[in-house]
Amino acid sequence: MQVKIITVCGSLRFKKEIMEISENMELNGNCILPPIYPTRIDKDAYTEDEVFMLNKMHKEKIKLSDAILVVNVNGYIGNSTNSEIEFAKSLNKEILYYTDFIK
């Protein structure tokens, strides 16, 4: 069986759902690259350079992936996630949506 590498994209407000679906996808034989969750309570504690690096590394994950999984709870897709979708499309990556798995 060919292992599919999938980067998870979505709003961090859906952390619980992202963690659950990431686990389920790995249990089904996929290699999952989840987003990094901020550890600093105050988002302003991150410098511009740190925010830039986190975003850059997430895009590197997308480059390495066969597909991205968009965790779009209740159909919500924010601006950052939308830009990740467009980036993945520009690389001809497969786009999977969380809402397609829960029907």
State what each model feature region is.
Residues 1-103:
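Conserved catalytic or regulatory cores that recognize and/or transform ribose-phosphate-containing ligands
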